[in-house]
Amino acid sequence: MIEKEVQELLSFIDGNPTAYHTTASVRNILLKEGFSELLESRRWQLEPGRSYFVCRNGSSILAFRMGEQLENYSFNVAAAHTDSPCFRIKENAEIHMGRKYTKLNTEGYGGMICSTWMDRPLSVAGRVLIKENDAITSRLLTLDRDLLMIPSVAIHMDREGNDRASYNKQVDMLPLLGGAAEEGVLKKLIAAELQVAEEQILGSDLFLCIREKAAVWGCNEEFISSGRLDDQECVFGILKGFLNAHCARSINVAAFFDNEEVGSGTKQGAASTFLYDVLHRIAQNVCPGDEDFHRAVASSFMFSADNAHAVHPNHPEYTDVNNCTYMNEGVVVKVHAGQKYTSDGMSMAVAKELAARAGVPLQYFANRSDKVGGSTLGNLAMAQVSMNCVDIGLSQLAMHSCYETAGARDIVSLIRLMEEFYASHFEETASGTLTISK
């Protein structure tokens, strides 16, 4: 039997082809749950027991719940990212090859597995900036049709194709839009979809997206596959746990950042001041001045959630001999001696204790010592606002493929861990001592 949470997760991912859609979906869920939207440009008047959220750039969102007893409060923060590797459409997009082919000019966004994007129906999604009187407004766009394809080269024309793992993104990876087409065909499609005049379109952030829906599979329905599991699976798990739990003595925060796949160094990325700005403004509403803010941060805790690599069934040698993970065996704690992950002895102890209280299994991941792994958002966010932090994720295969695979049972484990976390209060009671209570 497929868990309700799994069905909800897959529907969530299917409906969110870009970071802009993911942020809009989270925003709509929060509004339905009674949260109030704040603008960074306006004065904030926060009340105990109320719930709020703020968006930045339409692609990052921070939500928080005010406790009712905030004499010695802490921030309980869990963070994930809204973006995934894909291809961004360039500003002057159309390439017309005589009167034979029309292609789109694209560039890689993040470190995708290029071959997975070939020979499958694709479309276009993102945001479009529209002129409406004196205002520029942002509109979500999804061209809900099979529109493009990146064709591979026939084996007869490239006999070394199966041996070549290298792709030139400017040559091999440009998508075919059609045969002979008039200039401006893409803009016409966009204007028709949004029901605006072409002249109203002032700008856009558009990406290729796959058309294939998420699936549950395996002889015991134990696996799920979808685009963008990294990292919408963690976004969904954090959001569910955040909405399901409450602690009167804490301020719970769910933070979803854009641009993790390209380094997080944007105004809406985890390396920006977004998290600091929001936490500081919350603290100023609780008690003016910086003293209570610094006290709260010292007792605070953060989960940085980004998926982890599972042992590959055909290549188990790629993973560490005993710090390796499997799908459907629980939440992964990620550790790195070079501090690409924030996990240390204290933060891992906290994660272990919370998991035990929640009845959630934990497993541990470290790279092979002779391999260089990826990085994530936790250590970048900690450079702006420093608190105890642990890096976690869910185990998956084919990370950065356009269609990834994970365990069907793990999302429930993440939700339960987040529920326990958000129901807890943290307090630094002595140097090197963190007390966890309800």
Model-derived segments and spans:
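N-terminal hydrophobic/helix-forming segments and targeting peptides
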Residues: 1-438
